[in-house]
């Protein structure tokens, strides 16, 4: 089953993306480089739980 997750910017801007991932195929925390419009750069986004 796919689980909803939140990708939080490592630039400490408070910006985040929401997405889903398959926990069986990717048991580790997801890290992906995406665009942060607040700082206008590509930065690392790390997985966090949706509250």
Curated annotation (Swiss-Prot):
Q: To which species is this protein native?
A: Francisella tularensis subsp. holarctica (strain LVS)
Family, per entry: Belongs to the bacterial ribosomal protein bL33 family.
Keywords in alphabetical order, please. Answer: Ribonucleoprotein, Ribosomal protein
Q: Which GO terms describe its molecular function?
A: structural constituent of ribosome
Biological process according to GO: translation
Quote the PANTHER family the UniProt record gives.
Answer: 54S RIBOSOMAL PROTEIN L39, MITOCHONDRIAL, LARGE RIBOSOMAL SUBUNIT PROTEIN BL33M
Q: InterPro entries attached here?
A: Ribosomal_bL33, Ribosomal_bL33_CS, Ribosomal_bL33_sf, Ribosomal_zn-bd
What is the protein's given name? Large ribosomal subunit protein bL33
Q: What gene is behind this protein? A: rpmG
A GO cellular component annotation in the UniProt record: cytosolic large ribosomal subunit
Alphabetical list of SUPFAM superfamilies matching this protein: Zn-binding ribosomal proteins (SSF57829)
Q: Which NCBIfam families match?
A: PRK00595.1, rpmG_bact
Instruction: List, alphabetically, the Pfam families matched.
Output: Ribosomal_L33
